């Protein structure tokens, strides 16, 4: 289910297929002839046993905290382990291929956190079972009219998280309900502190069964994939002011993602390097690149300050629609220090060579 794509039209069906393709592009392993992945590893437990089934490791850490109620009355679920910030979800484009704040045809910013389905109201909070499809009434306009990658990799309040994960049924995500997927005083560690979740590396056919078992395709932890190579080329060309070549490589990624191609006219909206960096942040979202990118670009002192880390008001017990949909600072001890641009030299190395000098600030 994608809000705004309810009508049974060819255009909407193609959009949904694009979303599903992007999910499988990240999770399908070499046995499915996935040519996107160049180098990846098969995660293992310490005893050598395979650890990458749908219920383990990297996948489980990203899952919502309650996925299915098991036959014995207990719950199976994940840890809400990775939650994108407000800045991260704002980088993803609208359907028009522009950041939301720069798209004149997108909703006014004053409307972003208002209901898309006008006249609808929040359903009663479920207590003993997961929330029903009615929770889509709480989808806000910010989450409508976005590009395919947004729906493939970002989970938000009211969305259909995955089609089969709840005992072969969809999971409808309610991040306001402390009895299901929301913040709970009895389980304060497993809650999204931003009001969003990552869906990257969640296999679309993954299932948590009421019996307690799981099923679904295995995935690999990606080290290098094709998109990164195109983005690397685009960045190099942009640094050399070779605009045509930079756009050509960027557009390979955008076209596959279902986003319109960039032209030189778009350079009036953002500079070429800003387009390159934003495209990299979207395409490689949650793959471990961003921290190192902002360091080598030397912009970490701008984008890694505590004031930059914001999200929706998800760390509240059973908030109302209005209480939840507020932008608030993330309550985490986040701090950037300029010394982090360089890593320290190990003391053992320093002591072995009197001519070595420690990196500044350590």
What are these regions (language model features)?
Residues 1-86, 90-362:
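Acidic/polar-rich alpha-helix caps and helix-coil junctions
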């Amino acid at each position: 289910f994608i809000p705004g794509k309810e009508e049974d039209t060819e255009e909407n069906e193609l959009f949904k297929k694009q979303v599903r393709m992007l999910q499988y592009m990240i999770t399908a392993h070499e046995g499915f002839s996935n040519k996107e992945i160049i180098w990846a590893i098969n995660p293992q437990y310490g005893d050598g046993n395979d650890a990458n089934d749908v219920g383990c490791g990297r996948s489980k850490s990203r899952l919502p905290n309650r996925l299915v109620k098991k036959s014995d009355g207990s719950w199976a679920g994940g840890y809400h382990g990775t939650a994108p910030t407000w800045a991260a979800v704002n980088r993803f484009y609208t359907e028009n291929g522009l950041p939301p704040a720069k798209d004149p045809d997108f909703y006014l910013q004053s409307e972003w956190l208002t209901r898309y389905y006008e006249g609808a109201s929040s359903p009663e909070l479920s207590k003993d079972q997961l929330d029903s499809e009615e929770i889509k009434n709480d989808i806000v306009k910010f989450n409508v009219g976005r590009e395919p990658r947004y729906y493939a990799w970002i989970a938000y309040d009211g969305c259909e998280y995955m089609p089969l994960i709840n005992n072969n049924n969809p999971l409808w995500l309610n991040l306001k309900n402390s009895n299901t997927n929301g913040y709970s005083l009895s389980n304060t560690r497993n809650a999204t502190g931003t009001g969003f979740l990552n869906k990257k590396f969640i296999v679309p056919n993954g299932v948590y069964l009421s019996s307690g078992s799981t099923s679904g395709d295995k995935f690999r932890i990606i080290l290098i994939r094709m998109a990164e190579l195109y983005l690397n080329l685009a960045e190099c060309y942009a640094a050399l002011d070779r605009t045509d070549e930079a756009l050509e490589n960027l557009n390979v990624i955008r076209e596959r993602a279902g986003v319109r191609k960039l032209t030189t006219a778009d350079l009036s909206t953002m500079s070429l390097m800003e387009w390159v960096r934003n495209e990299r942040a979207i395409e490689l979202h949650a793959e471990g690149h961003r921290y190192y990118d902002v360091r080598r670009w030397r912009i970490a002192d701008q984008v890694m300050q505590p004031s930059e880390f914001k999200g929706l008001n998800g760390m509240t017990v059973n908030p109302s629609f209005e209480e939840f949909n507020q932008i608030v600072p993330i309550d985490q001890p986040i701090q950037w220090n300029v010394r982090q641009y360089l890593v320290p030299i190990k003391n053992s190395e320093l002591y072995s060579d009197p001519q070595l000098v420690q990196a500044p600030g350590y």
